[in-house]
Amino acid sequence: STCESMNLLGNKVQARNLAMKIGVPVVPGSDGAVDIEGARKVIRKIGLPVMLKAEGGGGGRGIFVIRTMQELEDAFVKASTMAEASFGNPRLFVERYLEHVRHIEIQVIADQYGNVFAFDERDCTVQRNHQKLVEITPSPWPGMTQKLRDQLKEYARALVKAVNYYSLATVEFLVTQDGTPYMIEVNTRLQVEHGITESRYGI
């Protein structure tokens, strides 16, 4: 059902695991929620800097950037406490912190018959404190080729199809300067950024 699909896609760790299962690239990181020792192991494997992210987080909250091993313990306790207070879920996972990336999202609309339509991207790279300030469609970035656009749309469609989700959703990606995309989360709701898609497409 869409209720179950929403719960799965709305949990960052489960959405990440689903993406890996169906071949959608994700940012290197932990396989699931970790404790401090688990976080240390992941960092030793993938290197610094990393982000501690709340499993149930959203809206740019619950993200802590770690640049040295010394910061980890203090940040882990803070992040976990904040995640519990904000989202009712203290669990954290680790992802590599990618710098100088574009934040690109693809909105899709799906019906109960398996049809999934993907709109052109929204570029939400202009941010402050991991929160979006300016959204642009189509992306003004010269690296946004038609090939990359089609690839992102295909990934977005594949994710919602994999769980038989029907309704609106937005799949968010980080894209490196060389055009390598990584899925970071799925929002199963009408986002505030929808306005620019509505202006462009009239939906």
Regions found by a protein language model. Give the residues of each.
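N-terminal beta-alpha lobe that positions the nucleotide/phosphoryl donor
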Residues: S1-V171, V175-R200
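Catalytic cores of secreted or luminal carbohydrate-active enzymes
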Residues: I203
